[in-house]
Amino acid sequence: AGGHLAQFLGVTAGVSEFEGDGGNAGQSSAVTCVVNVYGPSDFTKSYGKSVDAAEVLPLFLGGNLETQRFRHLLSSPLYWVTPRAAPTLCIHGTEDKYVAHEQAVWLVEKMKASGAEADLLTLPGAGHGFKGKDAETAEAALMAFFDKRLKK
């Protein structure tokens, strides 16, 4: 959920339907940048190779794709990409059985096509959750990305 929710914030800043009424109308909901670590971008397509996705998504979205297509679209960051999307780094392993690597590829391609800044760090052979050298590589990329965008 973390990668998906971070990415959703990165593409929906200023969209009135998502601003809410939490009493902070004077504060922007925009984020400076996003690191999406193996988060899904499109709930209407190949989510993963795991049976878990077919079981979990209906609980999260109130029904399966056939009965709640609108919610699946509405909840998918891929469909909210604009040139104003926050700069994004996606980090994803090619052997992720829960969220298919192509989810990151689709998002980065769409962001770049829109003119938004996006990069993809692909970790060959890595699954959902990084260990050892993959974890070190992901952490180094994440820290460099944040340092570039958040340090003044």
Task: Kindly give the residue locations of the regions a language model identified.
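Alpha/beta-hydrolase superfamily serine-hydrolase fold, recognizing
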Residues: 1-152
